[in-house]
A protein has these predicted regions:
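Nucleic-acid nuclease catalytic cores
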Residues: 46-151
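Metal-dependent nuclease catalytic cores that hydrolyze phosphodiester bonds in DNA/RNA
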Residues: 1-56
């Protein structure tokens, strides 16, 4: 599923249509979401890094919404949308804006594509401040736990 979507975002040739009808359905729903929301992809697999916190990640895609505002998105092939995904997107936004303070990210979007049922679920994450705070708390906790030896 992700390889078809990534090819679409990158503008590279889309692989032959998948034989599996579930995957076909998921890809079609993604393409419909893109068209219905007038999405313009501007980057995929964007590497992001925070010098301040020594963390890095790869954002699945950046896009322009119908208002021309820059948004970031992440594709998930899970059974649901979980709170940890919110922190991940907030982390990406935090790192992007640390790298380029002038870059404004309007929305953070999770696109969940079901592996088993061709379901497409799209969730915009509106509470950046709380999720960024939680992400930074996780970084602090990770750094505290790092030197603790296993018993």
């Amino acid at each position: 599923i992700e390889s078809y979507i990534k090819a679409k975002i990158d503008g590279t040739p889309i692989p032959d249509s998948p034989i599996n009808p579930i995957i076909q359905g998921a890809v079609l729903k993604f393409l419909m979401w893109e068209k219905q929301n007038d999405i313009k992809f501007v980057a995929s697999e964007k590497k992001v890094y925070s010098l301040k916190h020594n963390v890095a990640g790869i954002c699945d895609f950046l896009y322009l919404n119908k208002d021309g505002k820059t948004c970031l998105g992440d594709i998930k092939t899970s059974k649901g949308i979980y709170k940890t995904f919110y922190l991940q997107l907030a982390a990406y936004k935090y790192m992007i804006q640390e790298e380029d303070p002038k870059m404004q990210i309007e929305d953070m979007t999770i696109v969940r594509v079901g592996k088993d049922d061709a379901e497409l679920e799209v969730k915009n994450i509106n509470d950046y401040a709380s999720n960024a705070k939680a992400f930074l708390a996780c970084v602090i906790l990770h750094n505290i736990m790092k030197p603790i030896k296993k018993y």
